């Protein structure tokens, strides 16, 4: 057999399997041989792994000279070892109560190993509860370099969320620990919640309902033409910062209400009629409501501060269902209390739960919900299903949604 020609597999995980179709049968044989070296596996497992090649696989000159990426090799080796020895993977869910308070099933994860579920875990007990864990599933707890150094058996971290800012991804990568998130599971629920916050502010729901509860029905009716006058959204401008899947759904809701939608994102993409791409400052200047749907990164931390808030109309609203640290909370509270902003609807804060002295807790026209926009039952069911699928694919040596 002639030497296998050098080949380059794209560095991204190919769920479509297009990479497999472009590779010769000789390279396929080389992949099988490399898999055999990683551990005994069925032809079916090897074929599945081949179709979803992960990272770079370099074929060097001689036939059969192929190296598997460490993350795939480790996952496949662990899967084969556990299968051979008949020992299931130790899987620990540290704070399952935030996702499943008892109304859902953990069965998708139970099928993958020996599962231990804690409803809540104090941060100080995390390492103790993970001493024998090979895989951990968590939502809001933090795992950093110190914790990883004390957990030699840990090989996998799965987040019960899209965001993973509580995980030190760099430290995990250095220790060969794979981290996976769930990028798409609650877009509809979060967009719906963002709209509900906006409608609550526009229709003065909290204040008018409170007046009725306190026995001031007639006064509430009288003020409905004055301070309690609703704001009609049709014809107004909705600014959306971040045009990912949730931002796109929020845009669709705005269009359905007859609003013009202004968009800002790192990368512009095709948008429906009624949407217009603008610069960030223009968006804050021209919008009657601004809704944040961008990720929290070093570049976006504190994005909405005094400068952008000063550009907003005094009749405008700010909605944040993304991450609390996107907003300078002191600057926002000052803008609300000084009447430079009509209202804010927040589902997220920089610190959760907030300290009693957080100025937003007493700010004028500020509606705060406790980070529950994502929590629709349908979204949580989807979340558990994808978390289990992430782990299953890691066990088979073909991980998905890898962020480490």
Model-predicted segments: where are they?
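An N-terminal-biased, well-structured beta-alpha scaffold segment characteristic
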Residues: 83-180, 285, 305
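Phosphate-binding beta-alpha-beta segment of Rossmann-like dinucleotide-binding domains, i.e.
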Residues: 175, 183-237, 403
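Glycine-rich Rossmann-fold phosphate-binding loop(s) that bind the pyrophosphate
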Residues: 243-244
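N-terminal Rossmann-fold NAD(P) dinucleotide-binding loop
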Residues: 247-248
């Amino acid at each position: 057999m002639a030497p296998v020609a050098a080949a380059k597999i794209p560095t991204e995980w190919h769920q479509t399997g297009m990479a497999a179709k472009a590779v010769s049968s000789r390279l396929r044989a080389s992949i099988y041989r490399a898999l055999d070296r990683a551990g005994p596996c069925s032809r079916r497992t090897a074929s599945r792994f081949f179709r979803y090649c992960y990272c770079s696989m370099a074929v060097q000159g001689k036939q059969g000279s192929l190296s598997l990426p460490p993350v795939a090799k480790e996952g496949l080796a662990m899967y084969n070892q556990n299968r051979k020895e008949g020992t299931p993977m130790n899987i620990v869910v540290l704070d399952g109560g935030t996702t499943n308070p008892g109304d859902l099933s953990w069965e998708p994860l139970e099928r993958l190993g020996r599962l231990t579920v804690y409803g809540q875990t104090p941060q100080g007990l995390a390492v103790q509860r993970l001493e024998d864990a090979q895989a951990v599933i968590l939502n809001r707890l933090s795992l950093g370099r110190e914790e990883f150094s004390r957990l030699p058996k840990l090989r996998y971290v799965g987040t019960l969320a899209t965001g993973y800012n509580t995980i030190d991804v760099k430290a995990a990568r250095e220790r060969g620990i794979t981290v996976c998130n769930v990028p798409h599971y609650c877009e509809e629920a979060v967009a719906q919640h963002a709209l509900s916050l906006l409608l609550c502010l526009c229709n003065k729901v909290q204040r008018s309902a409170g007046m009725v509860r306190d026995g001031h029905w007639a006064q509430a009716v009288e003020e409905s033409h004055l301070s309690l006058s609703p704001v009609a959204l049709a014809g107004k401008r909705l600014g959306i910062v971040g045009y990912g899947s949730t931002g796109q759904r929020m845009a669709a809701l705005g269009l359905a209400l007859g609003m013009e939608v202004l968009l800002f994102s790192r990368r512009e993409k095709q948008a429906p009629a009624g949407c217009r791409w603008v610069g960030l400052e223009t968006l804050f200047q021209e919008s009657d409501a601004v809704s944040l749907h961008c990720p929290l990164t070093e570049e976006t931390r504190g994005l909405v501060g005094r400068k952008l808030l000063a550009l907003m109309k005094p009749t405008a609203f700010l909605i944040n269902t993304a991450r609390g640290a996107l907003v300078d909370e002191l600057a926002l509270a000052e803008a609300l209390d000084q009447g430079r902003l009509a209202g804010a609807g927040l589902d997220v804060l920089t610190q959760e739960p907030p300290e009693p002295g957080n100025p937003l807790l007493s700010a004028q026209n500020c509606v705060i919900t406790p980070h529950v926009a994502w929590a629709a039952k349908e979204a949580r069911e989807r979340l558990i299903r994808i978390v289990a699928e992430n782990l299953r694919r890691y066990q088979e040596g073909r991980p998905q949604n890898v962020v480490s």
